[in-house]
């Protein structure tokens, strides 16, 4: 048994019981209610954040208790009905809570109201605590605003219907809410702590530090909370409509006087009907006046029937009001269903209220409820009885069918409606029945089925009544519906037929029934008679109970209905109604304007018509057109909340069209339409692809939309579109009429006068006066000249021009016949038009502009006409000449013929000629024409007497035959021509198709060529192309610089051919690239400067050997090989002079770069740098990712022979390496070593990778230096752009680099050396050699007196010690030899690369060249270690002294706090009295000193930030907070109010403010650290290149000497003269690209001549060449 209890099923059931228990469910719902946060949390958080001390803890406790009690009241209100009604009734919370909230907000904004600062405890303590308690208690009763529907809070109320143990449920839900509240508060605290500790979030907070500090100082936390409270007030007012200030909706339609007169009953008591009408109106007014006061006060202020939600209003045509759809159609009540008690949601509410009323009056004994089992058994019993009855009836019918006699009850019969007609058939009357269709028969269809009372005989009635009365019947229908379980057998009664009183009871019932029938008949007759007499309907005696649908108390109308009722003013409706529904934007379009003139003419014509006034009212007939645009306000009711509107959701920041949330997924949110791209692709495919010979259009093209509609919609969619269009039309009309046309007339007539023609002033101005401007509606309906149409600014209007004026070149007095018809047609076409906004003419309103008759067209036509006449005259003359020639020939021919005829027989001249010819000639002609003629004999033809007749007949036959033959031949020719034409057409089609294919191929090839050309000219050209193109140019062109500046060039003896074509193509590519960059914005990032471009520019400007181009460039005539643009380009760049005066190459060390700088003068603008500030972190991030760092900077200037083998130094640099891949680094170095040994195997010299040495003259001139030109002053270069204060900051920088400038006892921080000034300008300067771009000369002389120097600039002083440098930074303690370099880097970080701190440095010394500098450095650092150990002991002593000073500070703070309290207690209102009470002189002196210090402090530039040193652990954070507050107070104007607020909130501590402590003391003690403000400038690649080259050319810096440096002149004189590094293309490339460059160069080395250059014997020196190395070696 014990094991059975531990079965799985029992455990599951136990768990389910626990989960479904009241306690667990209450805990669950209570826990959920914590997430429905209300405004009370603001007060709770305010108390927990702001309050401190004892009073703060009390306020926290009061806030939490008030918060908990408020929530407890809310839970109790669920169980306790009065509280629930008080808190849940509509508008009670808004009436009570909102005024309190607003009062609290406006009162709490005052700074001294319920102040949470330092106040007297006895005065305000109790009241403030009570106010905190009340705030948290009252605001807990408000609605929740984070979850607007408050669903989580309402779940508790919903569960109360199902819960029986209500008290347990309330307590458990309250406990669950407390648990959730505790978890929520703890999670908020942990979140705040996590934000403070997390650095990734703190950096975002620090980035907005200035904004946060300004916000904190401008307003307190209490002010922020007050703003949040005000937002909640607005939120509450926004979510619910204002209960008092609402729109009064008018629902009464007042009838007009005429209607009331017609509807009043006629009576002869009053002589005048108007008196009766006035009396009726007076009664109605009285009723209205009293009805206002009869309304209750709540309904007067709060109208619950008005429209709060923006629901759709469905207007009824009839007079009934619209049905309210927002009321619930469901009413929940218990009823019996299937033998069990269930909740019905369609129970009639009236029946439930009636049942409750009866249940109160009926005794409790009758209302006893049966158990569920008894009720179910009763239901089963009744169902069995019904089943048995049906079975018995069915069996009885089956048995009756077996019998012979048919009874009535065997089958179910149905009656049908029919029409009986009698017909005579064979002397017999036959009844014919015509039945209705089943669909139309009311007896068969369900809805229209009626009941027919069957008339039976008395015997049948008695028999049926007896049978019915024997059956069961119910006592009362009310018991069935309302009393419990009326179907039970207790309420059933039967009459026993065997009882002795059976017959008596039936007789009584029959008598009662007969009396009832008589009474019913009498009542029916009486009611019908009275109804007929009174004209009323028959009132049925059965009152049907029906449910009236809930209707709105207002009848709302829209704007259209309002305008319609305004127009029906004469028909009985008054104009006072206003619309409440917003309709879609529309406008009236009129197509018939019935003016007063037309009405008068119609009335005169129809004098007999008396109804003319009614038929033809002075109205404009038209229709309404809606605009095709989205409308958010459509069908909205005024006063409803748009934010709660359904089906239209605003889901984006800007939404032009209303969208339903159901269709958001189908909406395409792509930035470009895909359909347009598909269409474009298909069009290109159709153009390029093959087309069929005959294109068949299967698809019908969609009809094009009218342009007028588009223009109309355009002006309607624009805000105030019609207004602007109307003003423009008026302006164009006045401009056209009075300015444009008169000027044209004047200009035309002046030209005619100049051409000596008569002017046409009168004719032109007559045409100008004919032009008339009419104002029309938007659709072109005419109005008049002066009057505008109604609402012409909103709906728009048109200007119609009648007889528009067109300038003509001349006016004809009499028109010709052919010109008159043409001019009449033109006048009909241009009789009227409409004016456009641009001053043009259109035929239709909003139509396209039409062509106007041109002024010059008739002139050109006249000229063409005259030219054609002249041509005709010329042609006619030629024709007449030809005719004359032919006539002369013909006349001569006729003469000859006449002579011939006169010589022969005399034949009549006018007879036919062929008759008298011989037969032989005739047969010859006939044989020529055809062979089908039948030849007759001469005997037959020459019959006597008929000779003339026979010859004529024969001639006719002959002609007929010839015509036939000619026709046959013509038909044959036509057939041949048709065949030839078809074949030629086929050939032409084939040729066309082939031509199209060839054109398409040519077009595609052209596109491919352009694409490949674009790809070739892209910016990302491979680097090998540049290396190969410049390899032959760079090959063996090496220069040797002498100490003199005007050094001659060393020419080569053996010149190689230049690949000039390749270099020109590269040059063009880069010209295109440079032009594209010039067109774009000049301010771009340094990271976009490619190495390829820099390499090309350097190789182009320096290393080209111009001896190869001497013959081309030196030729002054027209060159066939080289363009003049290339010569000009070389001349502008300063690389090669166009005249070639110097036969030698320019100096490699100095002149080429100066000339290049002169050519790039466009970067010589210092104003550009001011406009390139961009965010600092972004710049650092991009530059950090894109800058390439050199691996082997530790190998600079070392005297080792083979620096590549130093593997220890290689391991220090791990650039471009991924983790766990150090083997790649070793492989790269081995490959470098192998390649360099192979390249320089024959030269046997120690070629260094990153060094190109050149000897230069170290002597430089002495000159004064101006401010802010430390890097830009070059010799013989007019440079205005310089690296000033703004440029030094970003010279060297990493992502998280911080420049910490410490102001210590013996160290000076200088942001720029330009601040050094010297009065003696002619003194000698200290020589500093710029051996490289970032070369750092370090003086190794250690015997300098540093005690007298306060600011040690780059002095490397041994005795200078930084406080706490060993303890605060343990890395420095273990590596003391780097301390000196580390602090020197902090002094001047913008000039020294960060990697030079850990690598070998070039230390100038007095030793000889052969001594090892690294060995001296090691000895020096060993001495430094000993020295630091001694200084450590001194530092510990100084630290003890500092702790003592700190204790003194704390004592001073306590004293100052006491003085502060006395100051605020006894401070008088007037400041002058205060000065009189104390020592006036001392205070005035103190304030004067402080003001002077402030002025001096504000005048200076402080691009630095203050910080405490990390070693001061005992100082409180309040010191730093005070310093921040002081800095903010300095920048404010009204300092007094803000300082008082800081002191009241205890954010400013007055004890720390001591008068004796100065900034200089803090600097001497080393407490403060200065951090510079970081700026960021954006420069392009050319600008950086310009600056770098300008720096590298400064051989000797023109510094002015300090006294300390004047003592070291002897040391400076002995400084070694060393070769300076020149910036060559090799250094700009990356390490891998350098390797490729050197390998390619090595293949073209001339090993026989190691120097690779032609030597000039005048300059050549072998001793010097031994010290040289190749430029790229």
UniProtKB/Swiss-Prot annotation:
GO cellular component: chloroplast inner membrane
InterPro entries recorded: TIC214 (IPR008896)
Pfam families found in the cross-reference section: Ycf1
Localisation per UniProt entry: Plastid, Chloroplast inner membrane
Entry's Gene Ontology BP terms: protein transport
Transmembrane regions: 18-38, 67-87, 90-110, 127-147, 175-195, 218-238
Membrane topology recorded in Swiss-Prot or TrEMBL: Multi-pass membrane protein
Keywords: Chloroplast, Membrane, Plastid, Plastid inner membrane, Protein transport, Transmembrane, Transmembrane helix, Transport
Function: Involved in protein precursor import into chloroplasts. May be part of an intermediate translocation complex acting as a protein-conducting channel at the inner envelope.
Family: Belongs to the TIC214 family.
Name of the protein described by the UniProt record: Protein TIC 214
Organism this protein belongs to: Lactuca sativa (Garden lettuce)
Species lineage: Eukaryota, Viridiplantae, Streptophyta, Embryophyta, Tracheophyta
């Amino acid at each position: 048994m014990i094991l059975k209890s531990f079965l799985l099923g029992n455990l599951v059931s136990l768990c389910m019981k626990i989960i479904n228990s009241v306690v667990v469910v209450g805990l669950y719902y209570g826990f959920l209610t914590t997430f429905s946060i209300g405004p009370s949390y603001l007060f709770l958080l305010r108390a927990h954040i702001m309050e401190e001390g004892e009073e703060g803890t009390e306020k926290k406790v009061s806030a939490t208790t008030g918060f908990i009690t408020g929530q407890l009241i809310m839970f109790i209100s669920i169980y306790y009905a009065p509280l629930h009604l008080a808190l849940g009734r509509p508008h009670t919370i808004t009436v009570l809570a909102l005024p309190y909230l607003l009062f609290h907000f406006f009162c709490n904004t005052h700074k001294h109201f319920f102040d949470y600062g330092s106040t007297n405890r006895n005065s305000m303590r109790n009241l403030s605590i009570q106010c905190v308690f009340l705030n948290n208690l009252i605001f807990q009763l408000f609605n929740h605003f984070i979850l607007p529907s408050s669903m989580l809070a309402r779940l508790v109320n919903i569960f109360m219907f199902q819960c029986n143990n209500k008290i347990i449920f309330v307590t458990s839900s309250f406990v669950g809410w407390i648990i959730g509240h505790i978890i929520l508060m703890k999670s908020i605290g942990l979140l705040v702590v996590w934000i403070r500790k997390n650095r990734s979030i703190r950096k975002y907070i620090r980035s907005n530090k200035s904004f946060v500090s300004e916000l904190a100082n401008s307003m307190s936390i209490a002010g922020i909370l007050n703003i949040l409270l005000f937002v909640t007030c607005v939120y509450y007012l926004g979510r619910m409509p204002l209960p008092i200030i609402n729109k009064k909706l008018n629902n009464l339609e007042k009838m007009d006087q005429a209607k009331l007169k017609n509807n009043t009953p006629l009576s002869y008591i009053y002589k005048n009907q108007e008196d009766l009408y006035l009396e009726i109106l007076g009664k109605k007014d009285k009723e209205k006046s009293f009805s206002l006061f009869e309304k209750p006060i709540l309904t007067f202020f709060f109208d619950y029937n008005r429209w709060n939600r923006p629901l759709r209003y469905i207007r009824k045509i009839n007079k009934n009001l619209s049905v309210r759809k927002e009321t619930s159609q469901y009413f929940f009540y218990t009823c019996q269903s299937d033998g069990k008690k269930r909740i019905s949601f369609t129970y009639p509410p009236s029946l439930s209220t009636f049942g409750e009323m009866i249940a109160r009056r009926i005794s409790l004994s009758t209302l006893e409820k049966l158990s569920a089992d008894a009720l179910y058994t009763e239901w089963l019993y009744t169902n069995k009885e019904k089943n048995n009855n049906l079975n018995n009836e069915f069996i009885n019918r089956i048995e009756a069918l077996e019998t012979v006699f048919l009874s009535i009850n065997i089958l179910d019969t149905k009656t049908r409606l029919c029409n009986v007609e009698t017909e005579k058939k064979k002397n017999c009357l036959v009844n014919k029945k015509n039945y209705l269709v089943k669909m139309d028969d009311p007896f068969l269809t369900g809805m229209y089925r009626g009941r027919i009372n069957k008339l039976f005989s008395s015997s049948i009635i008695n028999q049926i009544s007896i049978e019915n009365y024997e059956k069961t019947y119910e006592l009362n229908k009310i018991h069935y519906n309302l009393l419990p379980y009326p179907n039970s057998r207790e309420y059933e009664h039967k009459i026993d037929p065997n009882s002795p009183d059976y017959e008596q009871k039936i007789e009584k019932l029959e008598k009662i029934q007969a009396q009832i029938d008589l009474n019913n008949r009498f009542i029916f007759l009486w009611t019908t008679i009275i109804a007929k007499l009174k004209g009323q309907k028959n009132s049925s005696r059965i009152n049907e109970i029906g449910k009236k649908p809930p209707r709105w108390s207002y009848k709302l109308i829209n704007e259209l209905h309002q305008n319609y009722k305004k127009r029906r003013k004469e028909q009985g409706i008054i104009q006072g109604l206003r619309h409440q529904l917003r309709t879609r934007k529309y406008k009236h379009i009129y197509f018939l304007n019935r003016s007063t003139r037309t009405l008068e003419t119609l009335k005169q014509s129809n004098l007999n018509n008396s109804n003319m006034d009614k038929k033809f009212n002075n109205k404009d007939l038209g229709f309404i057109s809606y605009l095709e645009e989205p409308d958010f306000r459509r069908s909205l009711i005024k006063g409803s909340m748009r934010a709660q509107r359904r089906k239209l959701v605003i889901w984006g920041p800007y939404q032009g069209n209303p969208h339903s949330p159901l269709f958001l997924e189908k909406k395409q949110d792509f930035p470009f339409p895909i359909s347009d791209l598909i269409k474009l692709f298909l069009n290109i495919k159709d153009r390029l692809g093959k087309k069929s010979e005959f294109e068949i259009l299967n698809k019908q093209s969609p009809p094009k939309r009218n342009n007028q509609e588009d223009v109309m919609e355009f002006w309607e969619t624009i805000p105030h579109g019609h207004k602007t269009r109307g003003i423009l039309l008026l302006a164009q009309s006045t401009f056209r009429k009075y300015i444009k046309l008169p000027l044209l007339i004047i200009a035309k007539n002046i030209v005619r006068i100049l051409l000596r023609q008569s002017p046409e002033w009168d004719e032109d101005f007559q045409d100008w006066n004919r032009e008339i401007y009419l104002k029309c509606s938007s659709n072109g309906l005419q109005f008049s000249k002066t009057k505008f149409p109604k609402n012409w600014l909103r709906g728009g209007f048109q200007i119609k021009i009648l007889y528009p004026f067109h300038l003509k070149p001349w006016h004809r007095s009499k028109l010709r016949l052919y010109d008159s018809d043409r001019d009449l047609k033109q006048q009909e076409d241009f009789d009227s038009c409409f004016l456009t906004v641009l001053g043009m003419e259109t035929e239709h309103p909003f139509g396209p502009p039409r062509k106007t008759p041109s002024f010059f067209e008739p002139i050109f036509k006249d000229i063409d006409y005259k030219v054609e006449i002249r041509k005709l005259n010329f042609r006619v003359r030629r024709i007449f000449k030809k005719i004359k020639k032919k006539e002369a020939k013909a006349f001569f021919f006729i003469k000859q013929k006449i002579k011939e005829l006169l010589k022969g027989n005399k034949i009549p001249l006018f007879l036919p000629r062929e008759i008298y010819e011989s037969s032989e000639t005739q047969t010859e002609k006939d044989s020529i024409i055809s062979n089908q003629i039948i030849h007759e004999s001469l005997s037959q033809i020459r019959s006597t007497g008929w000779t003339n007749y026979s010859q004529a007949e024969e001639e006719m036959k002959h002609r007929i035959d010839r015509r036939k033959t000619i026709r046959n031949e013509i038909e044959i020719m036509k057939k041949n021509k048709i065949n030839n034409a078809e074949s030629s057409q086929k050939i032409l089609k084939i040729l066309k198709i082939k031509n199209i294919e060839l054109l398409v191929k040519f077009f595609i090839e052209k596109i491919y060529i352009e694409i490949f050309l674009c790809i070739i000219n892209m910016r990302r050209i491979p680097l090998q192309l540049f290396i190969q193109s410049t390899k032959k140019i760079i090959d063996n062109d090496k220069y040797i610089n002498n100490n003199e500046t005007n050094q001659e060039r060393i020419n080569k003896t053996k010149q190689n051919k230049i690949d000039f074509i390749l270099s020109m193509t590269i040059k063009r590519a880069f010209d295109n690239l440079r032009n594209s960059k010039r067109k774009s914005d000049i301010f771009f990032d340094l990271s976009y400067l490619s190495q390829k471009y820099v390499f090309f520019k350097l190789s182009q400007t320096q290393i080209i050997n111009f001896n190869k181009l001497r013959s081309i460039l030196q030729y002054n005539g027209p060159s066939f090989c080289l363009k003049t643009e290339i010569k000009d380009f070389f001349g502008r760049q300063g690389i090669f002079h166009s005249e070639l005066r110097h036969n030698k190459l320019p100096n490699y060390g100095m002149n080429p770069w100066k000339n290049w700088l002169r050519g790039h003068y466009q970067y010589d603008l210092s104003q550009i740098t001011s406009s390139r500030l961009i965010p600092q972190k972004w710049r650092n991030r991009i530059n950090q990712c894109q800058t390439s760092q050199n691996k082997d900077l530790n190998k600079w200037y070392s005297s080792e022979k083979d620096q590549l083998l130093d593997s220890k130094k290689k391991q220090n640099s791990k650039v471009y390496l991924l983790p766990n891949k150090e083997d790649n680094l070793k492989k790269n170095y081995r490959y470098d070593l192998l390649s360099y040994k192979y390249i320089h195997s024959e030269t046997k010299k120690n070629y260094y990778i990153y060094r190109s040495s050149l000897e230069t003259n170290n002597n430089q001139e002495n000159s004064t230096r101006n401010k802010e030109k430390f890097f830009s002053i070059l010799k013989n270069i007019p440079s205005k752009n310089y690296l000033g204060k703004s440029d030094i900051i970003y010279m060297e920088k990493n992502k998280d680099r911080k420049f910490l400038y410490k102001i210590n006892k013996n160290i000076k921080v200088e942001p720029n050396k330009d601040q050094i000034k010297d009065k003696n300008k002619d003194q000698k300067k200290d020589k500093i050699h710029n051996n490289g771009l970032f070369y750092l000369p370090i003086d190794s002389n250690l015997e300098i007196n540093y005690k007298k120097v306060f600011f040690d600039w780059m002095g490397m002083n041994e005795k200078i010690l930084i406080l706490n440098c060993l303890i605060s930074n343990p890395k420095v303690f273990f590596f003391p030899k780097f301390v000196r370099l580390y602090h020197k880097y902090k002094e001047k970080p913008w000039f020294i690369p960060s990697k030079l701190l850990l690598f070998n440095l070039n230390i100038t010394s007095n030793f000889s060249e052969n001594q090892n500098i690294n060995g001296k450095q090691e000895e020096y650092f060993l001495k430094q270690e000993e020295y630091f150990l001694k200084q450590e002991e001194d530092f510990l002593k100084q630290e003890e002294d500092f702790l003592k000073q700190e204790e003194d500070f704390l004592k001073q703070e306590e004293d100052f706090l006491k003085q502060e309290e006395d100051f605020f207690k006894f401070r008088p209102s007037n400041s002058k009295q205060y000065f009189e009470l104390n020592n006036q002189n001392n205070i005035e002196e103190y304030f004067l000193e402080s003001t002077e210090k402030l002025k001096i402090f504000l005048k200076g530039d402080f691009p630095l930030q203050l910080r405490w040193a990390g070693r001061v652990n005992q100082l409180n954070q309040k010191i730093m907070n005070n310093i921040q507050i002081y800095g903010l107070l300095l920048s404010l104007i009204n300092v007094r109010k803000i300082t008082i607020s800081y002191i009241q909130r205890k954010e400013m501590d007055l004890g720390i403010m001591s008068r004796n402590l100065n900034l200089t003391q803090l600097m001497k003690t080393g407490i403060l650290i200065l951090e510079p403000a970081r700026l960021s400038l954006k420069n392009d690649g050319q600008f950086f290149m310009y600056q770098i080259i300008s720096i590298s050319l400064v051989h000797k810096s023109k510094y002015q000497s300090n006294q300390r440096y004047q003592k070291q002149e002897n040391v400076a004189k002995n400084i070694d003269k060393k070769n300076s590094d020149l910036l060559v293309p090799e250094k700009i490339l990356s390490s891998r690209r350098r390797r490729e460059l050197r390998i390619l160069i090595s293949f073209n080395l001339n090993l026989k001549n190691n120097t690779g250059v032609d030597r000039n014997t005048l300059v050549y020196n072998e001793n010097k060449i031994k010290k040289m190395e190749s430029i790229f070696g």
